[in-house]
Design a protein with these regions (language model features):
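N-terminal "domain-start" segment that seeds a small globular fold
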Residues: 33-56
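Non-catalytic, surface beta->alpha helical segment in thiol-disulfide oxidoreductase systems
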Residues: 199-218
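Basic polycationic patches enriched in arginine
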Residues: 3-4, 15
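Thiol/selenol-based redox catalytic cores and closely related redox-interacting motifs
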Residues: 117-119, 123-205
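Thiol-based oxidoreductase modules, predominantly thioredoxin-like and allied folds used
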Residues: 92-109, 125-136
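Conserved helix-turn-beta segment immediately C-terminal to the redox Cys motif
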Residues: 61-63, 70-71, 75-99, 118-122
Length: 219
């Protein structure tokens, strides 16, 4: 084989091998990227005073993550949530409360005033975090992740407020049910002890139905 042909073949083999390694590395990086943000433990949020809190602090606990509001028709759910918290907290259950002002501007006021309102009116003891946005480009990354994991769960049409929400949202967007975004205050996400999102409940869901699933995850 002529020397020039030999070197050309060798160079071509090196080029092909290098390309192969590049593709392997790309596939590996893509695979690793897809595995990122698999659980809520990958996220850091801010408490009501602005301090960073890693959700790894809640590893091995069953969590209920809720976007809340203080001037909403569902605000009395704070009372039910507190009872749920008191009943199961010692068994490893935690409620993470994220006030949100995106729905009818029903969570006005500062983080501290919201906290004081909930303590005074409902005696809440579960953790409350800094007010967040849950939809849109500026949505908190945690809530973007939660939506990706569990889409709209549907209204309980037996609830008195459900027909009003259905009418309002369907007029705004006839296809709203097909989208995973948060529809209203007091949407709840249930997290297992591995940090995985296992269920989503809309604001109209009965708390006793949620409680049954919490009990199952605590076993």
């Amino acid at each position: 084989m002529p020397r020039r042909a030999f070197y050309y073949k060798k160079s071509e083999n090196v080029r092909v091998f290098t390309s192969f390694l590049y593709l392997c590395a790309h596939e590996l990086n893509t695979s690793i990227f897809k595995q990122e943000m698999k659980t809520i433990y990958d996220f850091t949020v801010k408490d009501r005073k602005g301090k960073d809190v890693s959700l790894k602090e809640y590893a091995n606990e069953v969590l209920l993550i809720v976007n809340t509001a203080t001037k909403c028709g569902f605000t009395p759910q704070y009372d039910e949530l507190e009872k749920l918290y008191e009943k199961y907290h010692a068994q490893g259950f935690e409620i993470l409360d994220f006030p949100c002002n995106q729905f009818g501007q029903q969570a006005p006021g500062t983080d501290e005033s919201i906290h004081e309102f909930c303590k005074l009116n409902f005696g809440t003891e579960f953790p409350r975090f800094k007010k967040v946005k849950v939809n849109g480009d500026d949505a908190d990354p945690l809530f973007k992740f939660l939506q990706e994991q569990k889409g709209f769960a549907g209204w309980d049409m037996n609830h008195s407020i459900a027909p009003l929400l259905e009418d309002m949202l369907s007029k705004s967007d006839p296809n709203y049910k097909e989208k995973p975004d948060i529809k209203w205050n007091f949407t709840k996400f249930l997290i297992n002890k591995k940090g995985q999102v296992v269920a989503r409940f809309e604001a109209t869901e009965k708390l006793e139905n949620i409680e049954a699933q919490i009990e199952e995850l605590l076993k």
